UniProtKB/Swiss-Prot annotation:
A lipid is attached at residue 2 (N-myristoyl glycine). One of its GO terms (molecular function) is NADH dehydrogenase (ubiquinone) activity. The gene is NDUFB7. This is NADH dehydrogenase [ubiquinone] 1 beta subcomplex subunit 7. The keyword Iron-sulfur does not apply. Accessory subunit of the mitochondrial membrane respiratory chain NADH dehydrogenase (Complex I), that is believed not to be involved in catalysis. Complex I functions in the transfer of electrons from NADH to the respiratory chain. The immediate electron acceptor for the enzyme is believed to be ubiquinone. A motif (Cx9C motif 2) lies at residues 80-90.
């Protein structure tokens, strides 16, 4: 995500979303059939597993399963490689989804800026392909 942050500081910051804030566009904008992501692990399950706040994400149910396996087969730390793989893969897919959402937000902000610019040009009396007289000289 570093490349996105560099674009925010070096490029036009108005079309780069802030990664620390929630998206400004609704998640079903352009996708009327899109379902909302839901947590599989409940709050009570995460409390029982004593997960810290950073671990309470959409992959918490895989982490709970992995920690339980580690506890049950303690001396044999290699017995839980499948659970570890499932958790890592879920974290990877979650990261990819968040990057896609970030890119979607960036493109929607660019689209919004282009539309506002087009409306401002039309209000000035400039049609598509026309330039202002001071620019033409």
């Amino acid at each position: 995500m570093g490349a996105h942050l560099a674009r925010r500081y070096l490029g036009d910051a108005s079309v780069e979303p802030d990664p620390l804030r929630m998206p400004t566009f609704p998640p079903d904008y352009g996708f009327p059939e899109r379902k909302e992501r839901e947590m599989v692990a409940t709050q009570q399950e995460m409390n029982d597993a004593q997960l810290v706040l950073q671990q309470r994400d959409y992959c918490a149910h895989y982490l709970i399963r992995f920690l339980k396996c580690k506890r049950d087969s303690f001396p044999n730390f290699l017995a839980c490689k499948h659970e570890r793989h499932d958790w890592d893969y879920c974290e990877h897919l979650d990261y990819v989804k968040r990057m896609k959402e970030f890119e979607r937000e960036r493109r929607l902000l660019q689209r919004k800026k282009r539309r506002e610019q087009r409306e401002a040009d039309m209000a000035k009396g400039l049609g598509p392909g026309e330039v202002a007289p001071e620019v033409a000289l």
